[in-house]
């Protein structure tokens, strides 16, 4: 039972949350807000060659908190949370493209490729025991993002 694992009474849990789904919803909201903040740091730096510290921090967080990642992203990273995260990333990137006069169907397909590719790379990385280290994985991911950006 969750309350036993957390070391709290059922009364304390239900004082704060209606049920376990309310807890998950709140935790997902916090993670999506973190992702939104990450996008705030990544999008303005898309033309820079150096890996943004926020991307390295994301991989370090996933490396240090694998249980949290598996809880949110589910088996094979195909959960409601994952879909929401992908939509958030795509919406933010598409918004940037449209602000610069873009947003064509071709760009939308390239963006879908990039977003799904990033998530696929993360799955492969976690399946490989989070090797290479977070810093190197962030650099690989950044290189892939920038390669697609050239095509946009």
Range-by-range predicted roles:
Residues 105-127, 132-147:
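Hydrophobic alpha-helical segments that form the core
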């Amino acid at each position: 039972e969750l309350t036993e694992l957390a070391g709290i009474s059922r009364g304390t849990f239900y004082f704060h949350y209606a049920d376990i789904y309310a807890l998950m919803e709140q935790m997902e909201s916090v993670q999506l807000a973190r992702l939104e903040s990450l996008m705030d740091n990544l999008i303005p730096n898309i033309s820079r060659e150096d890996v943004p510290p926020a991307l390295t921090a994301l991989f370090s967080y996933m490396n240090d908190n694998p249980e949290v990642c598996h809880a949110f992203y589910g088996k094979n990273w195909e959960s409601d949370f994952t879909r929401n995260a992908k939509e958030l990333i795509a919406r933010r990137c598409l918004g940037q493209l449209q602000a610069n006069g873009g947003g064509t169907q071709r760009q939308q397909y390239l963006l879908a490729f990039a977003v799904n590719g990033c998530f696929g790379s993360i799955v492969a990385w976690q399946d490989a025991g989070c090797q290479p280290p977070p810093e190197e994985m962030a650099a690989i991911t950044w290189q892939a993002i920038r390669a697609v950006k050239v095509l946009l």
